[in-house]
Amino acid sequence: MRYVYILQSIGDPDRYYVGQTEDLKARLQRHNAGEVTHTSKYRPWRVNTYIAFSDEEKAFDFERYLKTASATA
């Protein structure tokens, strides 16, 4: 199972991050521990939304869609 997730910064609620993972809990811990370069400045984070995909390719496609100008997370 792959999860596409949207994080929201607790300290800066207008700041969002989109990603994907197989282990959502562990990935959130890495974001909040400062181990992810793109999110370390705005921690702590909370999960705003997540969607589970059984098809890995569909998860990648959906994440890419959210990260493009055609979508707003």
Where are each of the predicted segments found?
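GIY-YIG nuclease catalytic motif and its immediate N-terminal context
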Residues: 1-68, 72
